[in-house]
Amino acid sequence: MNTGIIDLFDNHVDSIPTILPHQLATLDYLVRTIIDENRSVLLFHIMGSGKTIIALLFALVASRFKKVYILVPNINILKIFNYNMGVAMNLFNDEFIAENIFIHSTTSFYSLNYNDNVINYNGLSRYNNSIFIVDEAHNIFGNNTGELMTVIKNKNKIPFLLLSGSPITNTPNTLGHIIDLMSEETIDFGEIISRGKKVIQTLLNERGVNVLKDLLKGRISYYEMPDKDLPTIRYHGRKFLDTRVVYCHMSKLQERDYMITRRQLCYHEMFDKNMYNVSMAVLGQLNLMNNLDTLFQEQDKELYPNLKINNGVLYGEELVTLNISSKFKYFINRIQTLNGKHFIYFSNSTYGGLVIKYIMLSNGYSEYNGSQGTNPHMINGKPKTFAIVTSKMKSSLEDLLDVYNSPENDDGSQLMFLFSSNIMSESYTLKEVRHIWFMTIPDTFSQYNQILGRSIRKFSYADISEPVNVYLLAAVYSDFNDEVTSLNDYTQDELINVLPFDIKKLLYLKFKTKETNRIYSILQEMSETYSLPPHPSIVKVLLGELVRQFFYNNSRIKYNDSKLLKMVTSVIKNKEDARNYIDDIVNGHFFVSNKVFDKSLLYKYENDIITVPFRLSYEPFVWGVNFRKEYNVVSSP
């Protein structure tokens, strides 16, 4: 990171369309390392720090020299990248070749390069002399995309820009794959990773640390956004190691079926979906629960004396008394007195959405654009609503988030409760969330932070004085009240094995956190800083940001203003060239955001430079384009 660029900014205004100083400083590093030196880089910037914009700005610079391929995990994130590409282009202030930038989801990229599940090696020559940018790089390994990336690296000898806020997920294996992809050497995983009997005992050994430092020296960019401008987090529940957890004591009904599942069906309970399910809610016989297609065809099937299912619809008093779910019993009782929007995480792949829907409806909460709840709770004369996001509804997620994040919904009056599975763990931003709930304990520390990071991030809150409440719910036995104060108390298997599933998962999470933090610390130490004049390829981009910052505070100045000239000559040393640049931005009516006039253009008026406000106006319905037909029909009124 080029700290010399950061030093050019004083009291940077972040509330307008802008490129942050650390983003420009990182862009300088990427251009020098990837384009000039043809070396790969791991952009390890903690969530919420704006690494997407950095990557897209870099793609615009690189497009002048090479083709750039950007891979993203899924179609929804592809839409986010396409939108952000428009933002990046508007802020770029320099030439680029858009035709040289290709953005693919991993699925479409797989289809492009495989024939009948076999890599089309003849087609890989198209990637010669190109650059690859991989979003959420920690997720591409262990599947065909990871294999394809390795083949392209070995065949085409091209550099990669890998984006990640989480380089280690369940084990250090992921980090090993990243090292392998970024370096010119083949990694022997057996030499760098120590393995115990359990996953939590898989560690990067000292040899691995040395390999990491040797092979990735000069290839790491680490950045963590300062905590300023963020609301405080208020964790609820009882103290549990270094956090707080809400103990939700199971009823006799839930505990009975929970124990049947644990003792008889789960030989590897830490990874068994049934334990995820019964820890959130029990629904009777597991053989039925694991065959939902069959269950949904049942007519008035009794699951419990006070709970039945009919054609996929749950009904009965149990949805209100909630003996089937200690977590939802706590949740429903608690939300009645809370104000603001809620984000609720769950990862129950089999019947999570089914349970959530009918518990919410039965307790007076209405489905967004769906069924109305029984005796509905109201806000501003409208029903309080909920929505459930799963991988099956990807096509409508963007529209749903537009509603959830809209200023009109800051109080939750349009959509109050957003339930989501793992699909929301990455690349999405939620605004004005005041309550974050974990119905399922995340698998890793990285995933936990990703979920929090959807909401608690810069620019997500207008009022940061009000705290964000976090509830980490754990289903526990009716008589369980253990104080968990130290990991050292749970080093023996016999002590861990008797714990409730959620408590074991929390301990697993904390064991892994120690290893994750160790690797984060190593990466932070390896991230290099330097102070140099800006790279020639980003001079205009940097100047554009300096100009935006200058004219935010200045509505009218003399054409020969010494402060403006001093600012420009801090980048362009030649005064004549600096004056020519000022002529160009004024005559080209450079776009700025001014604190008095808001959106404005620069104009010369007599001997002054002035900011002239503008707005776009148009006649409604001048053109209508029907994209639903096989051909476009253009009509005018």
From Swiss-Prot:
Q: Output the PROSITE patterns linked to this UniProt entry.
A: DEAH_ATP_HELICASE, HELICASE_ATP_BIND_1, HELICASE_CTER
Q: Which residues form the Helicase C-terminal domain?
A: 327-507
Can you give the residue ranges of the Helicase ATP-binding domain?
32-185
Q: Could you list this entry's UniProt keywords, alphabetically sorted.
A: Activator, ATP-binding, DNA-binding, Helicase, Hydrolase, Late protein, Nucleotide-binding, Transcription, Transcription regulation, Virion
Q: Which GO terms describe its cellular component?
A: virion component
Localization: Virion
List, in alphabetical order, the Gene Ontology terms for molecular function in this entry.
ATP binding; DNA binding; helicase activity; hydrolase activity
Q: Which Pfam families match?
A: Helicase_C, ResIII
Q: InterPro entries, alphabetically?
A: DNA/RNA_helicase_DEAH_CS, Helicase/UvrB_N, Helicase_ATP-bd, Helicase_C-like, P-loop_NTPase
Give binding positions for ATP: H45, I46, M47, G48, S49, G50, K51, T52
EC number(s) per entry = 3.6.4.-
Q: Where is this motif: DEXH box?
A: 135-138
Q: Which family does it belong to?
A: Belongs to the helicase family. VETF subfamily.
The record's subunit annotation is: Heterodimer of a 70 kDa and a 82 kDa subunit. Part of the early transcription complex composed of ETF, RAP94/OPG109, and the DNA-directed RNA polymerase.
Q: What does this protein do?
A: Acts with RNA polymerase to initiate transcription from early gene promoters. Is recruited by the RPO-associated protein of 94 kDa RAP94/OPG109 to form the early transcription complex, which also contains the core RNA polymerase. ETF heterodimer binds to early gene promoters.
Name listed for the protein in its UniProt record: Early transcription factor 70 kDa subunit
Organism of provenance: Vaccinia virus (strain Western Reserve) (VACV)
Name the lineage. Viruses, Varidnaviria, Bamfordvirae, Nucleocytoviricota, Pokkesviricetes
